[in-house]
Amino acid sequence: KSFIDFIEKVPSFGKSFICIDDKNNNEIIKKIKIKNFYTYGTNLKSQFLIKNINQLKEFSEFNLDIRLPGKKNTTIKNVRIPLIGLHNIRNATAAAAVTITLGISKKIIKQGLREFKGVQRRFNKIFMHRETIFFDDYAHHPTEIKEVLNGVKQAYKEEEIICVFQPHRISRLKDLRNEFSSSFRKADSVILCPIYAAGEKKKLGFKYYNFAKQIIKNSKVRVYLVKDQYQLGKFAKQNLYGKKIVIGMGAGSISNWMRELPHLV
């Protein structure tokens, strides 16, 4: 209801842009009385339709079909962004959709997306060591983790994928542990770091070791527990070499841990 109220407060001369790849959004748009919105995504009903995705190691490429009421259908071909993952493609499509409705030319839109430098802590390449590439990402929610790992798997098909995960907030992990435990299916291994409590004082309420076992069961991956960043460094020095992708995930201190790994390995 809050989302519906928010969208219906957009004035008549404005527009909302809604990704209908999300099942909740599909339900929301059925209930919106004021139809001043556009839809986008891979869903075939999208007015800005993402098609023909080509996922490579350094970038994503796709076509964007534009199907707006009262206008001729058009396509922007070979849209390229220097980012990987469907979540980034959706974000780029949202930005493109807004600029298209503002009358910006397709040429400028393609150029702008191609030259976009990204943002910090979103699949940032940190360093390479013994053929292993290390990345840092802010993902700290089950859906984010799934999307990032899906993108990594599509881009790096031959490499072993290792996720270094630091849960953020005890309460979030406790409430969503089932969702979290199923989020790592596209990884080969998970290195589970201590929870970043973010000021929370209450007890965990379940055994962390059992959470590790739950990941093994639900995501079908190997799980390693480390107690601090120095143990992580020791593990990395002994095990992380060869063609591997190591991606740190979390909203806490894991970013610093990943950036200090070169000094520990």
Locations of regions flagged by a protein language model:
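Structural beta-sheet core signal
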Residues: 18, 39, 163-165, 192, ...
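Short acidic-hydrophobic, aromatic-tinged amphipathic segments that line or gate anion-handling sites
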Residues: 223-228
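Switch II (G3) loop of P-loop NTPases
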Residues: 134-140
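Acidic, Mg2+-coordinating active-site environments of NTP-dependent enzymes
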Residues: 1-134, 213-216, 222
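A glycine-rich beta-strand to alpha-helix segment
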Residues: 231-262
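Glycine-centered, small-residue-biased loops immediately flanking beta-strands
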Residues: 14, 188, 244
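Active-site beta-alpha connecting loops in nucleotide-dependent enzymes
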Residues: 119, 143, 150-218
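Short glycine-/acidic-enriched loop or helix-start segments at secondary-structure transitions
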Residues: 26-29, 49, 173-174, 201-202, ...
